């Protein structure tokens, strides 16, 4: 290509003039347009982590179970007895806002490829979703499209979606978040890496043909939205889950041979990123022959081929002499396969087109030599006033029962049954518990007796409001809550992946939020013994200058030695004792209650003592494994009253049944502060449990042994939730409000939403 490189062309490629000057310095000349395109995607935030890398290096990334940490397609941890788990979480936010079905679907496809590229068979997926105000005209459209895309792709792949969370807030009106998680299992001694090792080895393309979809998707994901957002639809990839299924099976068959030296998913920045990253990890060069790439569209240029983000494609470095073996297996699975390059020892990345070199670049500046910024940081200027807000000025509600009903109808708190009904969570029968609880529990079924009975727990979560008010503390809460959820099912947390969603890093207050959240995640992971083994950063989540809440999503994995010794959230037996592991402080700063009922998003998030957190988790984990408990449920959004209601309602059968066997509870809560604050405050490190009377003494002794406080509250029974001196509401009424929250959004039932409180936008939302 001979197009002149003007400042306008440089800007269109997402590079600053200073960065372009650095490109010229590395090359000692002007780049051509194809080379500029390569630098554009490799130096994008999405690929280079240029604003975040200096902070990410502070994460704890090693531990006794870590087999592969950050830097590869997915992290890998040791499950024992020769088995390992590969897992990762990744964002597809920008594409999902532009085209929700395909954006979400290809997000699932991409994270599945990241996992099976490591040599693992995916066995479970999860997701964390954020949408705007429930009454916003685009919220229902995005919710329906994203959920359909996730379900459509995952269901076709035969990988169950077993866990997730969905939250709503006005800050996501112009920028939804779609964070996808996948976990797979593999032999601990057969991990495949994305490396272009072995000079002379062939580089092979396998999978679907290359088209023009997704060109500059990585660059688009590294810029904020504006009024022209709808024009960016061509940068959204189009997925084919049936092709991905063939690619998965072909790769797993290839991994059983000695043909694979290295393998890399063609994800963001497509052929360019996969080939450059493989060369960079090996310290080698590559010669690529673009005229050999299988194409599905005529007239594609080298620029388009290199930057296409067509889905369901892999780049494989084969052992020399094993090309026919690779061809045979790929042909068997009806995949395109071609030799498209060779590994060289030159340290240069060269692209050829019909005998002519169209790009000749050094590898290092594209990888480790990419720009790294220590951007200016300053606390958000709104925080002093928000922290100074006098919570005692909040009026007390006239009827705590009505308040609870309104909170349960809030889409963030309401049942997500409509969502997980769109997902095939029972495929392969790996799920040991139904979705909707604290953490998913997945059976490990390998056919090997050594693995029989083992299970994996999965939890995902974040709290953007906490992270705005105190990024360091809010991020710690995200880690602690995921670990607490895993403890509720009897699991031991072992490792973390993350998806760090933030606004424009060029704004000092956003960069400060990012750095503080990273510091908080690191501190909590060190305290809880959960190293970070993989992750993703998504910046520029802004529309016309309005950024999202800082949302560092955590995906945590835990191990269960005996999957039959787990626990669910629901109260089960009349007469069971109800107790709270933890304390009652009535901390409402940053709470759903304060936002929903009083239009305020202010104060400080609840205090968090990580030593106390560990004691609470250890108490419940050991109690579950000893078989002492009938139920265990994390106390978080909406506080104690919401947790009690959920435990009563989760006893029921799915919506639509003629009779729902709800079960009630009668409790007496000590009130060290205002009743509404104690009932709806979101104090940290609390788990609500129930148990047979005969287990109570042993449970109290266990809690004392672990150093965790326990408060006996009451008993399970009846058909009403009664909190003595505060509220008494039939469980059927609670369940009706709880189950209608999300369907009301989909009906665009603004009148109902306003009446129930679910669409009440805060009068003073966070800046």
Curated annotation (Swiss-Prot):
Main location per the UniProt record: cytoplasm
Recorded name of the encoding gene: purL
UniProt GO cellular component terms: cytoplasm
UniProt-listed GO biological process terms: 'de novo' IMP biosynthetic process
ATP-binding found in the keyword field: yes
Subcellular location, record wording: Cytoplasm
Positions with a binding annotation for Mg(2+) 1: 90, 536
Catalytic activity: N(2)-formyl-N(1)-(5-phospho-beta-D-ribosyl)glycinamide + L-glutamine + ATP + H2O = 2-formamido-N(1)-(5-O-phospho-beta-D-ribosyl)acetamidine + L-glutamate + ADP + phosphate + H(+)
Signal peptide: none
The protein's name: Phosphoribosylformylglycinamidine synthase subunit PurL
Keywords for this protein: ATP-binding, Cytoplasm, Ligase, Magnesium, Metal-binding, Nucleotide-binding, Purine biosynthesis
Known function: Part of the phosphoribosylformylglycinamidine synthase complex involved in the purines biosynthetic pathway. Catalyzes the ATP-dependent conversion of formylglycinamide ribonucleotide (FGAR) and glutamine to yield formylglycinamidine ribonucleotide (FGAM) and glutamate. The FGAM synthase complex is composed of three subunits. PurQ produces an ammonia molecule by converting glutamine to glutamate. PurL transfers the ammonia molecule to FGAR to form FGAM in an ATP-dependent manner.
Location of the active site: 46, 92
Source organism per UniProt: Anaeromyxobacter sp. (strain Fw109-5)
Pathway: Purine metabolism; IMP biosynthesis via de novo pathway; 5-amino-1-(5-phospho-D-ribosyl)imidazole from N(2)-formyl-N(1)-(5-phospho-D-ribosyl)glycinamide: step 1/2
The EC number(s) this enzyme carries: 6.3.5.3
One Pfam family recorded for the sequence: AIRS
Record-listed Mg(2+) 2 binding positions: 114, 265
PANTHER family: PHOSPHORIBOSYLFORMYLGLYCINAMIDINE SYNTHASE SUBUNIT PURL (PTHR43555:SF1)
Complexes and interactors: Monomer. Part of the FGAM synthase complex composed of 1 PurL, 1 PurQ and 2 PurS subunits.
Domain of life from the UniProt record: Bacteria
